[in-house]
Amino acid sequence: MQEFEFAVPAPSRVSPDLARARARHLDWVHAMDLVRGEEARRRYEFSCVADIGAYGYPHATGADLDLCVDVLGWTFLFDDQFDAGDGRERDALAVCAELTDLLWKGTAATAASPPIVVAFSDCWERMRAGMSDAWRRRTVHEWVDYLAGWPTKLADRAHGAVLDPAAHLRARHRTICCRPLFALAERVGGYEVPRRAWHSSRLDGMRFTTSDAVIGMNELHSFEKDRAQGHANLVLSLVHHGGLTGPEAVTRVCDLVQGSIESFLRLRSGLPELGRALGVEGAVLDRYADALSAFCRGYHDWGRGASRYTTRDHPGDLGLENLVARSSG
């Protein structure tokens, strides 16, 4: 996998509690029946996907870090249920509906619920603990929008057309899961962005540009893997629709990432004015901006050496086991 480096405006940091959290997380995925057989466990440990929790939330320790690594691990396991290619797509779509009900209606996982639903319920109970109703409502919306992106992904895949770059990015903004993970930063940071500021176009733009940067890095990291498996990727879209060579398309995505980072910094420079206009304390806005930067830096640092994106026999794939089928017991 080719390495890429970008000027992310945050220092490289990793939670000092990573080793303990990683060991405890492996026990959690086993207890949740998310990783069963020996090969699945080997692949999961090899992928190091949950480590993003320690990279993206470097100040988190203890139970807060446990929540971060569990949520991140869950997102990758959920993602790969849609790439298994063994006919489980119908069950995966049903899981999206069940999780949406769990979030919107407050329904609980049942004894028949698939392991991926039970695990999410466990994460969501911890994630929302101690947070305001306003935070819960907006975070539910972010999770539901993420879940709604997966039926679109399956429909586009069944159609077989290569999406143009703009359409590809729109779809990826939903399934990349950045926005729920930004809400997680507030939860483990012990603060909430005031409603008036959170809904401002400036902060929304900062979330968007951070997501754009993470998406671009993800497309670069996963390009070789996606090409080998015949999956959609922004680089391939640029080649198909833009008439670019592979190297030219890679350069274009690199430019997208760096441009998104620069746009983020321009938006951040206006936070003092926003705080004064809305009567919001500048410190909380800076803290939120720092959290977005830290997540972007954490993904950047983790992704550069992630075993997740190797191509040889696809050892980073986590879809070996069906986690979306309902229990027959």
UniProtKB/Swiss-Prot annotation:
Mg(2+) 2 binds at residue 79. Binds 3 Mg(2+) ions per subunit. Mg(2+) 3 binds at residues 218, 222, 226. Gene3D superfamilies: Farnesyl Diphosphate Synthase. A motif (DDXXD motif) lies at residues 79-83. Mg(2+) 1 binds at residue 79. A motif (NXXXSXXXD motif) lies at residues 218-226. It catalyses: (2E)-geranyl diphosphate + H2O = (R)-linalool + diphosphate; (2E,6E)-farnesyl diphosphate + H2O = (6E)-nerolidol + diphosphate. Its cofactor is Mg(2+). InterPro entries: Isoprenoid_synthase_dom_sf (IPR008949), Terpene_cyclase-like_2 (IPR034686). Keywords: Lyase, Magnesium, Metal-binding, Plasmid. It comes from the Bacteria. Pfam families: Terpene_syn_C_2 (PF19086). GO terms for molecular function: magnesium ion binding; R-linalool synthase activity; terpene synthase activity. The keyword Disulfide bond does not apply. GO terms for biological process: farnesyl diphosphate metabolic process; geranyl diphosphate metabolic process. Substrate binds at residues 172, 225, 308-309. Its EC number is 4.2.3.26. Belongs to the terpene synthase family. Homodimer. The Asp-Asp-Xaa-Xaa-Asp (DDXXD) and Asn-Xaa-Xaa-Xaa-Ser-Xaa-Xaa-Xaa-Asp (NSD) motifs are important for the catalytic activity, presumably through binding to Mg(2+). In vitro, catalyzes the formation of R-linalool from geranyl diphosphate (GPP). Can also accept farnesyl diphosphate (FPP) as substrate to produce trans-nerolidol. This is R-linalool synthase. It comes from Streptomyces clavuligerus.
